[in-house]
Amino acid sequence: MAMTKHECTYCNFDEYDVIDKNDYGVILPEPNALTKGHSVIIPLRHINSFFEITDKERKSLQSLLELARNELKLRHQPEGFHIAFNDGDVFGDAQSDHLHIHIIPRYKNQPLKLDSRWGIISD
């Protein structure tokens, strides 16, 4: 994609990285994955908040989330999923001001270790 004026990482994703896509959103691999298969679902339109998306975008993102879940279950057989919305500019980085949904596969006997990206400061 062409660079946009706001230099958003999610607006400028590489088509080569796309796992799946529809008219309103895309599934991408999370570059700093917390577990095997960790992915993000993003709306194609640069938008800051889940509460600002249209009904069509909401349905599209839900469809992509379900598709990602089904594909991850098939490929990696996780025990479950941690699903998190990053809504608003809460972390102060270039990605956080573009709404995105993390789908993080959870595996038996593998604790989820969150870091400062999630507002968690290690002791």
What are these model-derived regions, one by one?
Residues M1-D123:
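HIT superfamily nucleotide-processing domains
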